[in-house]
Amino acid sequence: MNKKYKGIGVLAFAAGSLLPGATANAADQNAAGPSDGAAKKPNIILIVSDDTGYGDLGVYGGGEGRGMPTPNLDRMADEGMTFFDCYGQPSSTPGRAAMQTGRIPNRSGMTTVAFQGQGGGLPKEEWTLASVLKTGGYKTFFTGKWHLGEADYALPNAQGYDEMKYVGLYHLNAYTYADPTWFPDMDPQLREMFTRVTRGALSGKAGEAPKEEFKINGQYVNTPVVDGKEGVVGIPFFDRYVEKASLDYLEANAKSSEPFFMSINFMKNHQPNMPDPDYVGKSMSKSKYADSMVEMDARVGHIMDKLRELGIDKNTLVVWTTDNGAWQDVYPDAGYTPFRGTKGTDREGGSRVPAIAWWPGKIKEHSRNHDIVGGLDLMATFASVAGIKLPTKDRAGQPIIFYSYDISPVLFGTGKDPRTSWFYFTENELTPGAARVGHYKAVFNLRGDNGAKTGGLAVDSNLGWKGPESYVATVPQIFDLWQDPQERYDIFMNNYTEHTWTLVTFNEAITKLMKTYVEYPPRKPQSEAYSGPITLSQYQRFSNIREQLQKEGFQLAMPTGN
């Protein structure tokens, strides 16, 4: 074991032992899929939108009720399974890393959003959905938002994807930084830096250097080629290219003897929401967010229609979901969540996301599911459906652990959900900021609870990344998510209904989780930003711990912020 990280694992276990909480290691996922062994393996398509709210779709109580009809996703839900207790992560990069790797983001180091020019990204040692499925004979394709780094080794075509087309590397608003019409007060030297380091839409096959197809900016412009050279495509038009790449790939591979896996990632509905001109004013509410929601729904519908048209729908598993909870900090250019908290918090509003699974003839129509599932479970589930065993070593030959459960028994009605818990992490948390076991939730990280008044008699706004860091002093808040999904009533100590006894369960689960960090240490963070000062006394205490560990042969870097 690498001594540099072994020390971190020991400290993690110690911290986990001190916190009241709980967890379990992921189950062994070796089951074969539901299809006949002699039949062609199913195609698998993962469609991910960005920042879509839990309450935006009609099937979740939104749709026309929110002034933004979603007939295509609602049809997908009516023909498949809708999940009501599905979890992403509190922000885009960890949410996408969790889906792609099947690992808690702090294990891969993909814990927070990076800015352009920072380099790095998803470690080359990690397995992805694509690299695992390729071991089972799948062709693999990626298009749209990646957000897992900009170094060549971290790009989709170096992470198991045979081909990538029109890949966006950053959060959507990053493409406005260099635009003087957006930020006329920006220092010219800083603007020049953003112009220089921001990579545009990338395409390329595995083993090839990526090609920049066009630049991306925050204007209503669609000139991908100018005088035979790369041009510029504005944010409003980007998802046109993602849809086109998807439809072209389906056309080209519909009759292939090999199964395929597609990862399709729309930029909608991340702020700034700038709808394609074809969809401006097409929602009932006429807002930019609602128009963008109608656009995203239509593009998903076009992909689903193509599957039916090509006659491959009966042998294709499609999963649609989003990366994280609604970003209430940027209201009104944001999705809606009925839950407490927002993107960037350990509250339900930060991580609970909409999700739909569809496979005609395999998944029962109009299924409604309330089991604990999440984006982490895609890895084990897709591997199971494809008849593949998950690897026990990473791509560099070192032992690896997944936190992914095979939920195919849930999809196909053949068994119960193997997952009984969920752990919530924000940014660089090594131990969970919150934990759910069954229908009870313990909250240790109170970020987002001190929102500023929005005016009049309005409720407090939810401050996610903008809010102060705050942890409970000794005991967590306890919520019953069946009776109180909005986390309004702390039942830890409240007269005869007190639930202090739940600490035993949470302690057991979190301690079990943290023990795995000793055997499988986390990778170093792949992106870090200054998050505030540390005090001299904190620095001195850490220095003393560091010196003691050095005597035992362990190395720890000094901290730079809280």
Locations of regions flagged by a protein language model:
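Formylglycine-dependent sulfatase
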Residues: K3-L18, A22-V472, P476, P485-E508, ...
